[in-house]
Amino acid sequence: MLNAKKSNKTKEKETDWQERVIQVRRVTKVVKGGKKLSFRAIIILGNERGQVGVGVGKASDVIGAVKKAVTDGRKNLINIPLTNQNSIPHIVQGYSGAAKVIIKPSAPGSGVIAGGSVRTILELAGIKNILAKQLGSSNPLNNARAAANALINLRTYTSVLNDRNLDLH
């Protein structure tokens, strides 16, 4: 009886997650006999409650690449501190390769103002009022990783106080 309840809870947890395919690209590797084709999939998954992950998978078929990307995304989940207005506490920047992403909180009701893979990350993280700008690179993988890097660097007021060994009063 307990096992049935446990499996229902895990099914509920799994259904909360949303997955979006950012890119599926056919890539080649030059080997002795010629070229070997494979597929690379970039997936972003999130629960719209402050958790998001970026995953990359490669396989000889598209379905296998997507499955590998989903498992990679689950391994690379990050927690994002959200404010009461479904935004972020402060301005952050993230880098990955030549890509630079600047993410700023915006006024309530302004929505998600961002493009490409950065927009997908912010939507799946549950952020509703945000402004983001991609600089440097148009590569979706580097921009997604730069956005994730920026969101990792978010700090809350209480975490800063704890780091400085200060009290709230």
UniProtKB/Swiss-Prot annotation:
What cellular-component terms does GO give this entry?
A: chloroplast; small ribosomal subunit
Q: Where in the cell is it found?
A: Plastid, Chloroplast
> Which residues are in the S5 DRBM domain?
17-80
Q: Which is a Pfam family this sequence falls into? A: Ribosomal_S5
According to the lineage, what is the superkingdom?
Answer: Eukaryota
Q: Name one GO biological process term.
A: translation
Checking InterPro entries in the record gives: Ribosomal_Su5_D2-typ_SF (IPR020568), Ribosomal_uS5 (IPR000851), Ribosomal_uS5_bac-type (IPR005712), Ribosomal_uS5_C (IPR005324), Ribosomal_uS5_N (IPR013810), Ribosomal_uS5_N_CS (IPR018192), Ribsml_uS5_D2-typ_fold_subgr (IPR014721)
Name the principal localization, coarsely classed: plastid
Q: Name one GO molecular function term.
A: rRNA binding
- What does the UniProt keyword field contain? Chloroplast, Plastid, Ribonucleoprotein, Ribosomal protein, RNA-binding, rRNA-binding
The record's SUPFAM superfamilies line, in alphabetical order, gives: dsRNA-binding domain-like (SSF54768), Ribosomal protein S5 domain 2-like (SSF54211)
Question: Which Gene3D superfamilies does the record cross-reference, listed alphabetically?
Answer: 3.30.160.20, 3.30.230.10
Of which family is this protein a member? Belongs to the universal ribosomal protein uS5 family.
Describe its function: With S4 and S12 plays an important role in translational accuracy.
NCBIfam families attached here? rpsE_bact
Q: How does it assemble?
A: Part of the 30S ribosomal subunit. Contacts protein S4.
What name does this protein carry?
Small ribosomal subunit protein uS5c
Name of the gene this protein is made from: rps5
